[in-house]
């Protein structure tokens, strides 16, 4: 089954906390230092430190994700959707490394986190908690799987398409928004009647 290793947990958390601290410094002093591509010496050091911490955090979170053995959850949509969403966190961090030196737009890293990780976690947990708290089995049918897939496609379109074809940015934004709306629309259509009625097991709540 899934493994938990304390040193991996420490590196996963510690590297991200350190990255956040450097982000805070960059926010406070970056404009004065000229941080980023073409920066002065101090700004360049800040960019290198940011990229190094983002790379370290990405490696730690990929390792952590792999220890969970996500390949064994492919038959359980309520679980694999969370593993898939989590994978966007190290992808976000790797994109930050590239963005730090002007290799690509920082917006791609941001959307890997927001659309991919947060969007996927949100749709996964909304379905899981809605089913659990209304007395239903923790099972996902083809409608839930379709919603999960559409949110994943939205992330791939928003991040992947501009990455390989920068001129298609606006097309990527439009297609991603449509996929997102469709995925959340399926959730709303499926779960409105579930969430506005009493529990099916007769228990309060």
Regions found by a protein language model. Name each.
Residues 1-205:
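Hydrophobic alpha-helical transmembrane segments of multi-pass integral membrane proteins
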